[in-house]
Amino acid sequence: MKIKIYIYILLACYIASFLRLFINNNFIVSIIGSLLFGFFIDKRLSYSIEKIILSGFFSCFTSFSGFIYFLYKVFNQGDLMKFIIFCNLIIIINLLVMYFGFWISRKIT
């Protein structure tokens, strides 16, 4: 790969991390990321550089570590039912929002 690709990935990661500073809520970041990801999935990006840049952006913006830590705390409290419910809700809601972004993208184009 050329150095130019690495610079683009780095810039996408910086932008995503910068945006993350303004939104300090893991759930909202996850919803926004899922919506945008669903929107861009439909674009069927043909260039690998675009795919790589978007991967870098979404990896930094929607870091799943915040949810994992939240689920870890719930699990350590011993509330297994709450853990199972939250884990499933997080996955289901994000999938639905991602599909909604995909649907919006289809309606626009």
Curated annotation (Swiss-Prot):
Entry's localization field: Cell inner membrane
Transmembrane residue ranges: 21-41, 52-72, 84-104
Catalytic reaction list: fluoride(in) = fluoride(out)
Broad class of where this protein is predominantly found: membrane
Pfam families, sorted: CRCB
Membrane topology (UniProt): Multi-pass membrane protein
GO cellular component, one term: plasma membrane
Keyword Magnesium listed: no
Keywords of this entry: Cell inner membrane, Cell membrane, Ion channel, Ion transport, Membrane, Transmembrane, Transmembrane helix, Transport
GO biological process: monoatomic ion transmembrane transport
Family stated for the protein in its record: Belongs to the fluoride channel Fluc/FEX (TC 1.A.43) family.
Functional summary from the UniProt entry: Fluoride-specific ion channel. Important for reducing fluoride concentration in the cell, thus reducing its toxicity.
UniProt protein name: Fluoride-specific ion channel FluC 1
Origin organism lineage: Bacteria, Bacillati, Cyanobacteriota, Cyanophyceae, Synechococcales
Gene transcribed to yield this protein: fluC1
